[in-house]
Amino acid sequence: MLITETFHDVQTSYGTTLRIYVYSPKIAGYPQAKFPGVILYSEIYQVTGPVRRFGQRIASEGYVVVAPAIYHNFMGPEALPYDVQGTDIGNEYKIKKPLESYDEDNKLCCDLLFQLPQFDGKRIGSTGMCLGGHLAFRALLDKRVTCATCFFPTDIHSRTLGLGQNDNSLERVSKELGNNQEMVLIFGTADTHVDPQGRDLIRKTLRDHGVKFTFLEILAAQHAFIRDEFSKGRFDSAITQSCLGFLFEQFNRKLRIDLGEFVDDNTPLEHVC
């Protein structure tokens, strides 16, 4: 499926301009075609080449993808380089940006989708990697977001996102998710940013609160395994392709199909071989 690319500059309550990149499917002969929406959150480097290609990949499957440049509080929409200086700047901004500003970014992305003529006006999914995985997780606090696929989300277990480094993402998401919302969380067992104890904390908290989720720990996969350049030796194409299967299964089921109202079926499952 062909795609088109553009961007929208949106004013925030912080007196800044949020640039939101838009990747849309294009089907020859069907200029009025409409598609579900996806919010794509980047790493600490803003919308880099790997993030852009990830957005294009999702759009090519028939989704309108919006990708915000999240550091509008401090800089323009340009991407930070994958070097020491870019990493230091990205990590600095990550904990200087108010949590409320992250949430406003998410609201503005949802609002923009509903203004786009190619959006079907129904359901939205979210995804992202690293910092973006956390933001995709937190995006579920907006009930317009039906599902999320979060790649190696950082800082959820440590509660260190945003100004003051004291976020409430895990607590709020685990308590506030609706029956029609769900998520996929994907980590590598060799991820040095989210240790086994941190992964266990996330999984147990979600399970204890009855959240609908899939939790993957991929043997030997490292942090940033989805980044197809400047990954510092961690990119794994085969694992990335496998994980996209989970993403598209969730998006196709939750965003494309009209499931109707949720009905809680407590019928015990039959124990069969």
UniProtKB/Swiss-Prot annotation:
Instruction: List all disulphide bridges recorded for this chain.
Output: none
Recorded hits in Pfam families, A to Z, give: DLH
Instruction: Kindly list the GO CC terms recorded for this protein.
Output: cytoplasm; mitochondrion
Q: Which positions are catalytic residues?
A: 130, 191, 223
Q: What is its EC number?
A: 3.1.1.45
Origin superkingdom: Eukaryota
Q: SUPFAM superfamilies per the record?
A: alpha/beta-Hydrolases
- Which GO MF terms does the UniProt record name? carboxymethylenebutenolidase activity
Q: Which residues form a coiled coil?
A: none
EC class, as a word, reads: hydrolase
UniProtKB keywords: Hydrolase
- This protein's record includes keyword Hydrolase: yes
The catalysed reaction is: 2-(5-oxo-2,5-dihydrofuran-2-ylidene)acetate + H2O = 4-oxohex-2-enedioate + H(+)
Instruction: Return the similarity comment.
Output: Belongs to the dienelactone hydrolase family.
Q: Which PANTHER family match?
A: CARBOXYMETHYLENEBUTENOLIDASE-RELATED, PTHR47562
Know the name of this protein?
A: Putative carboxymethylenebutenolidase
Origin species: Saccharomyces cerevisiae (strain ATCC 204508 / S288c) (Baker's yeast)
